[in-house]
């Protein structure tokens, strides 16, 4: 909390998010925005190798997040995607845990973590997890935070199944060939 003095991004370290989400979050935060998240298009986050869980975003008419609906067992099909037999709109925006936050959020996070550590952990010592999306969802429900959803059309890559490794490697090779990334990532710094 003493190091983060400017707006920042929180991501999962083992996922690939693309460039657009970072750019959108950066632009929003440097213009004075406080809290935002990258909303990935559902079809750009699915695995060819099995079902996945995604947080489908509900928003108001101004693209403010109102709720994240955790939806399990989402699979691709001929029409797009479904979860347990229910057709899903593949253009829906989903949370892939890419948050843009202001330093002031750290105080709220700290008090939430303290409550979690004192009240939740003792009841479930082995499996208790403090999840930022869950915490932000609670803050939304209490009206204590407003989160702008910023659409990104980039493809998200994760390693949900071991079979995903080949597809992810092929995608990165293709990005190198197209010049999206350089072989030496930091050569231009």
Regions found by a protein language model. Name each.
Residues 1-2:
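A conserved donor-nucleotide-binding helix/loop in the catalytic core
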Residues 13-16:
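The conserved acidic donor/metal-binding loop of glycosyltransferases
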Residues 80-87, 131, 137-154:
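Glycine-rich loop/turn
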Residues 103-104, 163:
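Alpha-helix/helix-capping structural signal
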Residues 143-146, 153-189:
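Hydrophobic helical membrane-anchoring modules
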């Amino acid at each position: 909390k003493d190091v983060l003095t400017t707006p920042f991004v929180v991501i999962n370290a083992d996922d690939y998010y693309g460039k657009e989400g970072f750019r959108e979050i950066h632009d929003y935060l440097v213009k004075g925005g406080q809290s935002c998240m990258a909303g990935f298009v559902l079809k750009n986050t699915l695995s060819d190798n099995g079902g996945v869980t995604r947080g489908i975003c509900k928003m108001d008419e101004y693209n403010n997040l109102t709720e994240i609906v955790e939806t399990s067992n989402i699979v691709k099909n001929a029409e797009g995607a479904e979860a347990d037999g229910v057709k899903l709109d593949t253009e829906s925006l989903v949370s892939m845990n890419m948050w843009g936050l202001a330093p002031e959020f750290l105080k709220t996070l700290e008090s939430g973590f303290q409550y979690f550590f004192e009240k939740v952990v003792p009841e479930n010592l082995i499996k208790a997890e403090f999840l930022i999306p869950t915490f932000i969802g609670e803050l939304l429900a209490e009206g204590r935070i407003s989160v702008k959803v910023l659409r990104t059309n980039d493809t998200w890559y994760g390693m949900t199944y071991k079979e995903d490794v080949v597809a992810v490697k092929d995608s990165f090779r293709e990005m190198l060939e197209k010049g999206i990334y350089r072989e030496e990532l930091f050569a231009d710094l």
